[in-house]
C-alpha cells in the first residue's frame, strides 16, 4: 500500500469515527419521543436535575411509591415521589450527592435505609431516604455493581464484578458478615422466596449459579445455552422460571429452575441489560443500550410472544416496574440536556 493510500485509509477511518461520535451525540442531545406502541401509552418524562454534561443512569428501584435512580456519571442518587395518575414535578425529586459511579440501590425494609454501590470508590454507601443524608460508608470488594435485599435472612447482598465476589452485609449492624467467591464476574441476581436461595448470573462464563446465603457458598451452577454475556435477570416464582437477557448475543432466554435448563430463547434489541417480569400482567419487559423496549406476553409457562417493540433513545438500558400500578419506568442517557425517565402505562 502506498503512503497516499495508507493516509486515505487512516483519514477515512478517522472520519468514520467522528461521524459515529457526531451521530451519537445528536441522539443523546435530542431524546425525542418513543415510537408508537400497541400495548403501552407513553405518559411523558420525569426530568431529573442536571449534574454533568453527560449523564448515564444505571439501576432503577421502585419502593413504597418512590422511584430511586442512580447516576453512573455523577454518583447522585435521585428519589422521586410517585403519584397515581400524574407525572412527578421538580418538587418531587430529591438528591443524595456523593462520589461518581453509583450503580445499584436497594432499600432495607426493616430500617428504611438505602444502600448504594459505588464502583470507583469500592464502597457501599448507606443513607436515609427520609432526609437524603449519609449514614455510613462500607469498603467492599473491587467494582461493586448489583445490590439486592434478601428478605429471608434480612441481609443485603452486593456483587463485585472485578473481584468475582458476593459481599453480604447485615443492615442492622451496618457491617460485612461474609464474602462469597462466585467463580466469575457477576451481574444481576434474583431471590427465590420458595427456597430462600439467590440465583446469580456470571457474565464472563455464561453461567447461572445458586448462592446460599445461609451456607455462605455457591451450591449449584449451570451453563446457559443460547446466552452469551448474561446480564439482567427476573424470576417467575409461581412457575419456577428465570428470565435472563444476554448482552453479547442479544437474546432473552427462559430458564426452567425445576428442569435445570434453558427452555426457550428470543432475539431482542441490541445490548440488552435489564429485564423485569410483571406477574400481574404476565408480561416481560427488556431494555438495552440500543434503546429498544421489548414486551413479551407469557401465554403459558411454555409459550411466549412479542407484543411490542418500542424504539426509545440510545442508552436507555435500565428499567423498573411499579407492580401496584403496572407503570413502566425507563432511564435515559443524556448529553447537555437534563437526564430523564420515560414513563409508560399499559393499555387495557
Model-found features: residue ranges?
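Predominantly soluble domains enriched in secretory-pathway, periplasmic, or organellar proteins
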Residues: 5-6, 17, 21-348
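Short, Lys/Arg-rich N-terminal segment immediately upstream of the first membrane anchor
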Residues: 1-10
Amino acid at each position: 500500500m502506498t503512503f497516499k493510500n495508507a493516509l486515505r485509509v487512516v483519514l477515512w477511518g478517522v472520519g468514520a469515527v467522528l461521524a459515529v461520535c457526531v451521530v451519537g451525540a445528536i441522539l443523546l442531545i435530542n431524546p425525542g419521543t418513543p415510537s408508537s406502541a400497541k400495548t403501552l401509552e407513553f405518559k411523558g418524562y420525569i426530568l431529573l436535575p442536571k449534574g454533568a454534561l453527560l449523564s448515564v443512569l444505571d439501576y432503577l428501584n421502585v419502593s413504597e411509591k418512590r422511584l430511586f435512580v442512580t447516576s453512573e456519571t455523577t454518583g447522585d442518587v435521585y428519589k422521586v415521589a410517585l403519584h397515581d395518575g400524574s407525572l412527578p414535578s421538580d418538587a418531587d425529586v430529591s438528591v443524595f450527592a456523593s462520589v461518581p459511579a453509583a450503580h445499584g440501590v436497594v432499600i432495607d425494609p426493616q430500617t428504611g435505609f438505602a444502600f448504594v454501590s459505588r464502583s470507583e470508590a469500592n464502597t457501599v454507601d448507606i443513607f436515609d431516604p427520609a432526609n437524603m443524608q449519609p449514614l455510613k460508608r462500607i469498603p467492599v470488594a473491587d467494582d461493586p455493581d448489583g445490590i439486592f435485599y434478601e428478605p429471608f435472612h434480612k441481609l443485603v447482598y452486593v456483587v463485585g464484578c472485578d473481584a468475582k465476589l458476593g459481599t453480604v452485609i447485615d443492615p442492622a449492624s451496618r457491617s460485612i458478615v461474609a464474602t462469597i467467591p462466585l467463580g466469575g464476574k457477576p451481574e444481576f441476581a434474583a431471590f427465590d422466596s420458595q427456597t430462600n436461595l439467590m440465583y446469580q448470573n456470571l457474565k464472563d462464563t455464561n453461567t447461572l449459579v445458586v448462592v446460599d446465603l445461609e451456607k455462605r457458598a455457591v451450591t449449584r451452577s449451570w451453563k446457559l445455552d443460547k446466552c452469551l454475556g448474561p446480564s439482567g435477570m427476573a424470576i417467575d416464582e409461581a412457575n419456577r422460571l428465570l428470565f435472563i437477557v444476554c448482552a453479547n448475543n442479544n437474546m432473552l432466554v427462559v430458564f426452567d429452575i425445576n428442569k435445570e435448563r434453558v427452555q426457550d430463547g428470543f432475539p431482542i434489541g441490541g445490548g440488552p441489560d435489564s429485564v423485569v417480569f410483571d406477574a400481574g400482567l404476565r408480561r416481560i419487559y427488556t431494555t438495552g443500550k440500543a434503546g429498544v423496549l421489548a414486551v413479551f406476553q407469557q401465554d403459558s409457562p411454555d409459550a411466549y410472544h412479542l407484543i411490542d417493540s418500542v424504539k426509545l433513545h440510545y442508552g436507555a438500558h435500565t428499567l423498573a416496574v411499579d407492580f401496584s400500578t403496572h407503570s413502566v419506568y425507563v432511564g435515559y442517557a443524556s448529553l447537555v440536556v437534563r437526564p430523564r425517565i420515560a414513563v409508560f402505562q399499559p393499555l387495557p
